[in-house]
Structure formats: structure tokens, C-alpha cells
Amino acid sequence: MRLFLSLPVLVVVLSMVLEGPAPAQGAPEVSNPFDGLEELGKTLEDNTREFINRITQSELPAKMWDWFSETFRKVKEKLKIDS
């Protein structure tokens, strides 16, 4: 009885699998499969360049360097006094 029911189900499943993708699921016109990846890379490159330019043109790196230098100098002086 089980075999009698499972064979038609198996035939239907195999026919669906072998039929291939539906037209809506078919791949769009594929001129180059890496076009999307290339576009993503260019966008990422542009955003990274813009971010680096913003950082180099801002005063933040200079202020941070001054703060670290001053803090290091203070710690160094404290260690000299305590030793």
C-alpha cells in the first residue's frame, strides 16, 4: 500500500525538479555575473576614500596626538617622582 502511494508522489516530485526553474525564477539577462560585485567594490572604495579624506582633513588626529603626548608625559613624570 505504501509503495502504491509513494510512486505517484515520487513521479510528481521528479517531474517538478526536472522541469527547471519557472520563468519568474529564471536568471535575468546575464552579461557578466560579477557586475553586481564590481559595483559593490566601487561603492566601497569611494566610501572608504571619502572617510579617509575626512579624517586627514579634520583636526581630530592632531588633537588626539596632543592628548596622548600630554598624558604620556604626565605618566612619565609621575613614575620618575615615585621611583
Swiss-Prot record:
Signal peptide: 1-26
GO-annotated cellular components: high-density lipoprotein particle; very-low-density lipoprotein particle
Lineage of the organism: Eukaryota, Metazoa, Chordata, Craniata, Vertebrata
Gene Ontology molecular-function annotations: fatty acid binding; phospholipase inhibitor activity
Keywords, comma-separated and alphabetical: Lipid transport, Secreted, Signal, Transport
Record protein name field: Apolipoprotein C-I, acidic form
Organism the protein comes from: Pan troglodytes (Chimpanzee)
Annotated family: Belongs to the apolipoprotein C1 family.
InterPro entries hit by this protein: ApoC-1_sf, ApoC-I
Miscellaneous section: Apolipoprotein C-I is present in acidic (APOC1A) and basic (APOC1B) forms in P.paniscus, P.abelii and P.troglodytes and perhaps also in baboons and macaques. The two genes for ApoC-I arose through a duplication process that occurred after the divergence of New World monkeys from the human lineage. In human, the acidic form has become a pseudogene sometime between the divergence of bonobos and chimpanzees from the human lineage and the appearance of the Denisovans. Pseudogenization resulted when the codon for the penultimate amino acid in the signal sequence was changed to a stop codon.
UniProt subcellular location: Secreted
GO biological process, any: negative regulation of very-low-density lipoprotein particle clearance
